[in-house]
Each structure stands twice: as C-alpha cells, then as structure tokens.
Amino acid sequence: MTKVLLFLGLLAIPRASWPQSDARPEILVLGTYHMANPGHDIYNMRADDVQSPERQQQIAQLIEVLKRFHPTKIAIEADVGSQRIGREYSDYLAGKYTLSRNEIDQIGYRLAKELGHRAIYPVDVDGDFPMLRVINYAKANGRKEKLDAIGARTAARVKAQDDFLRSHTVLEMLEYMNSDSLVAKDVAEYFAMVPFGEPWEYAGPDLLASWYQRNIRIYHNVVARIDSPSERILVIYGAGHLGWLRQDIANDATVRLRKLEDLTGRAPIS
C-alpha cells in the first residue's frame, strides 16, 4: 500500500507544484447519445435526423448552455492519435468542411468554433471488452438466463431513451442521460457482470476491469491536457462512459467535477 501511495504522489507532482489556492481545474463530462447511429455498442439507440431544422435549433440551444461553462479546451471521443480530427477541424474553421451527423461535429466542432478555439482534443483509447467470455461462461455454467435478464434490462433502458428522445429536445435528452439516477443504473449493469466467474475464470470481473482500464486511460488523456489551475475542460463522450469518468474526476483531489445540471440550474427530467 505504501508503494501505491508513493506512486500516486509522484504522479501528482506537476499539478501539486502550482501555487496553492482553492482554484482547481474543472472537468465536465457531457454524456451523449450517438447522433449518427454508428451501431458500435451492444445495445444502440436509434436517433432521428439531427440535421433536421428542428433538431438544429435544439443543437444551437444546447451550445448556448454549454458556453456557460466557459470551456478552455474541448475533448472528444476520437482516437488520441488521430490526425484526421485536426484536419477536419481546421477545414471546418476555414469553411471547407461540412458537419456530419456525429456528435463530435454537431456539438464539439460547433462549440469550439464559436468559442474561438484553434484546436480540439481527441482523447479516446480503444480497449478490450471480453463479453464473449462472459456469454460462454454463463452458457457453460447454467447462468444464461441471469445474463439474458441483464441484457433485457439494458435493452429496455435503451428503448426508454429512444422514446424519450422522440418527445423531447436535444438538451432535455442530454439532461436525462446525464442525470445521477440514470448514470447509476448504467454503472449498476456493469457491476451485475461481476458474479459471472469463479477462481481462475474471472470472466465477469475481467470484463469490468477492462472497462475500468479503458476509462482510466481516457481520463489520463484528459488530465494530460491541463496546463493551469484555471483550466476548464469539456469532455464530450458516449453516455456509457459517463459514470466511470465522473468517478475518476470525483476521486482526483486535484480537479473539480462539474455536471450539466450546474449549467441549466434545474433538475433533470426523469
């Protein structure tokens, strides 16, 4: 334990060397649905056309709310080594790129341009998600019915989000998805995987550990962009990452966690 604390102390040295005050960098993670319907997740929402005139007005409303955070940097869910993002954003600033339906474009690029940012920061890192191991373990050990029940709950929650989006604005949808109650339910479904395993075949725990690993690496890439205690980083990410990234921020004493509801001044619709 002593070695762990020493290691963590060494990691904190660069930011700990700043002048001591109550000022800390602030990080706000905006959990979003995937507006372009890429279908990359096990359970996926079916979003309507974000480029329709009505949705575009709603995106503009969302942008105005996010400006209240006064972001100094915007981080997005794209590969940390991506050169494409830099080219696209530069072309967008030059009027040579047409925004796609992706939330990176619709929220990230638009907001960054309106704030006068010259760059936008990809922070994603891919990771293993060994769901097949969990499925095979459940089948081999008479636990398939329990695993199916977890999947059914997740599918029902995604369906409820589909229904919610059809009758609410983009801002209201994101308020709903970023609410503490919905985030807690999402995190709970990951922890429901923990019992699927036994000594020497930790299928469920390994899945959760892999997810933890990916998200803490993402968080590393976010905090690596902090240059001063007055930094305010907006992180735009798929909502499945929200609970885990918030946990990282909340447990890091060198930064301050902010939430969407801090900007709206109202409780999320639930």
Predicted region positions:
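N-terminal post-signal-peptidase region of extra-cytosolic proteins
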Residues: 48-63, 93, 220
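Hydrophobic, often amphipathic alpha-helical segments used for membrane interaction and targeting
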Residues: 87-226, 248
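A cross-kingdom marker for long, charged
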Residues: 208-270
